[in-house]
């Protein structure tokens, strides 16, 4: 299906503002049933879940990580803490709620990403990757290593709408993913949580295609390809 590609948010420089804007778009989608797509990036940070904010030393962890250059932000979708930065491209799909099948929306989310990977000569699949951050059965995986994490948030039906689904993916395009993995673990260590993640469980597109150019150039190329796939709707059906 073709998506309406939402414009970059010039004033939304922080993840908090970007994520808040997506909640407005989600309500718009619930009312008009038009699928939308949003490609975005965040500066270096960790984005955690509402559940994580209830950890016993959460506030102290946020203060320490901000001092180390990894400020903490909160999202409404599920999962665990995840790293963000210049080498990570995020895809958010805002979808009308047409079924209660979680897998349906994850496959809609995965379709353009799998097509993108194929354009780079890579074959991805869905699978768990034990030890990776935000692990789940709808990770996109290459050679047993995670290249995309996924999550969802549902807006329940209301009096004037049938509900909508926000499906989010973070594509690891470039950068030091092991450092990001270590910092996600450090959040839980500092906050008093039990989760820990293992370096070597994730990979990047740059690693997989042996990219020799700049990380920014690769991210720009990926963004352009994904924008084309999303707006033209030339992906296999989920």
Regions found by a protein language model. Name each.
Residues 1-100:
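N-terminal lobe of the biotin/lipoate ligase/transferase fold
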Residues 56-59, 99-104, 177-182, 214-215:
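Short, conserved charged micro-motifs
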Residues 60, 108-115, 217, 221-225:
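Long, highly charged amphipathic alpha-helices
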Residues 83, 101-109, 132, 197, ...:
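Short, contiguous, pocket-lining structural segments
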Residues 88-131:
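Contiguous, small/hydrophobic- and glycine-enriched helical/loop subdomains that border
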Residues 120-122, 146, 153, 157-238:
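Long, positively charged amphipathic alpha-helical accessory segments at protein N-termini or as interdomain linkers
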Residues 126-146, 151-155:
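Beta-rich nucleic-acid/ligand-interaction surfaces
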């Amino acid at each position: 299906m073709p998506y309406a590609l939402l414009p970059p948010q010039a004033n939304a420089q922080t993840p908090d503002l970007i994520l808040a804007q997506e909640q407005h778009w989600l309500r718009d989608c619930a009312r008009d049933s038009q699928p939308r797509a949003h490609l975005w990036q965040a500066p270096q940070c960790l984005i955690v879940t509402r559940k994580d904010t209830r950890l016993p030393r959460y506030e102290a962890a946020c203060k320490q990580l901000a001092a180390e250059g990894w400020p903490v932000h909160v999202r409404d979708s599920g999962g665990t803490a995840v790293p963000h930065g210049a080498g990570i491209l995020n895809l958010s799909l805002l979808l009308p709620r047409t079924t209660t099948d979680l897998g349906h929306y994850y496959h809609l989310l995965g379709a353009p990403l799998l097509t993108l990977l194929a354009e780079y000569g890579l074959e991805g699949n869905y699978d768990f990757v034990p030890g990776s951050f935000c692990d789940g059965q709808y990770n996109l995986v290459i050679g047993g290593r995670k290249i995309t994490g996924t999550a969802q948030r549902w807006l329940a039906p209301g009096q004037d709408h049938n509900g909508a689904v926000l499906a989010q993916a973070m594509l690891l395009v470039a950068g030091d993913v092991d450092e990001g993995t270590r910092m996600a673990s450090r959040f839980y260590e500092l906050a008093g949580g039990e989760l820990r993640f293992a370096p070597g469980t994730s990979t990047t597109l740059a690693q997989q295609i042996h990219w020799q150019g700049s990380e920014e150039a690769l991210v720009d190329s990926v963004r352009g390809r994904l924008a084309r796939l999303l707006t033209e709707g030339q992906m296999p059906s989920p």
